[in-house]
């Protein structure tokens, strides 16, 4: 929500997928047609396609795609406590794959297109056998990294924002957890967005401050 609010404040047109809430209603009233609200169930392929179709009809092109790959909105009400983390990973993996697949044609029509995928400690976990080699099929950040060259060949830059990983480190520098708020994290990410860095390390002291558990 903070990313949407700050992008609108900077004068951008923003399309967002999120559950109906008072905060989005307020932003829509303030910014009118500059805010396009899309279906939120992006882990469902049909809903992701519907969102992309709405975006295509409204704008016809997309300059930047920012994927919140740590969302908890996709958790079903009946999910058991033991399955929460695996469901966060698998549902965000589906949403990310659907979003990127649907959005590429629109990005190709955009100006200097780029993608930023943002992960937290939970959604960056490796599925199935954690001792196995990290690969795109069991780790969503790695799935994006494996897609980087293909995107680059099409003129699309990719930034992966994720916690530091001991198995697949992207930097030798230590990143210490910080007390990020939604506003400060959004401001930092938007400042880094134009730099088009391949990797950014985001360590958060309190995950629920940025990704509250939606249950």
What are these regions (language model features)?
Residues 1-15:
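Canonical Rossmann dinucleotide-binding motif of NAD(H)/NADP(H)-dependent dehydrogenases/reductases
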Residues 31-46:
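Rossmann-fold cofactor-recognition segment
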Residues 49, 70-86:
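Conserved mid-core segment of classical short-chain dehydrogenase/reductases
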Residues 58-59, 75, 102-111, 150:
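A short helix-coil junction within the Rossmann-fold of NAD(P)-dependent oxidoreductases
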Residues 100-101, 145:
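A short, exposed helix-loop element centered on a Lys and neighboring polar residues
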Residues 108, 113-153, 165:
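Catalytic loop of short-chain dehydrogenase/reductase
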Residues 154-156, 160-161, 172-215:
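C-terminal helical subdomain
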């Amino acid at each position: 929500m903070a990313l949407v609010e700050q992008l609108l404040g900077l004068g951008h047109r923003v399309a967002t997928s999120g559950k109906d809430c008072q905060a989005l209603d307020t932003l829509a009233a303030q910014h009118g047609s500059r805010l396009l609200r899309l279906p939120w169930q992006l882990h469902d392929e049909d809903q992701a396609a519907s969102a992309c179709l709405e975006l295509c009809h409204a704008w016809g092109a997309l300059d930047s795609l920012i994927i919140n790959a740590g969302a908890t909105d996709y958790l079903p009400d009946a999910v058991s406590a033991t399955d929460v983390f695996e469901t966060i990973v698998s549902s965000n993996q589906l949403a990310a794959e659907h979003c990127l697949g649907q959005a590429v044609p629109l990005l190709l029509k955009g100006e200097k297109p780029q993608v930023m995928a943002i992960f937290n400690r939970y959604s960056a976990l490796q599925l199935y056998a954690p001792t196995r080699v990290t690969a795109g099929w069991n780790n969503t950040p790695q799935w994006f990294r494996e897609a980087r060259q293909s995107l680059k060949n099409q003129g699309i830059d990719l930034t992966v924002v994720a916690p530091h990983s001991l198995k697949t480190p992207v930097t030798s520098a230590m990143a210490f957890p910080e007390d990020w708020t939604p506003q400060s994290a959004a401001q930092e990410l938007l400042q880094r967005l134009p730099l088009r860095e391949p990797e950014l390390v985001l360590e958060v002291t309190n995950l629920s401050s940025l990704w509250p558990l939606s249950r």
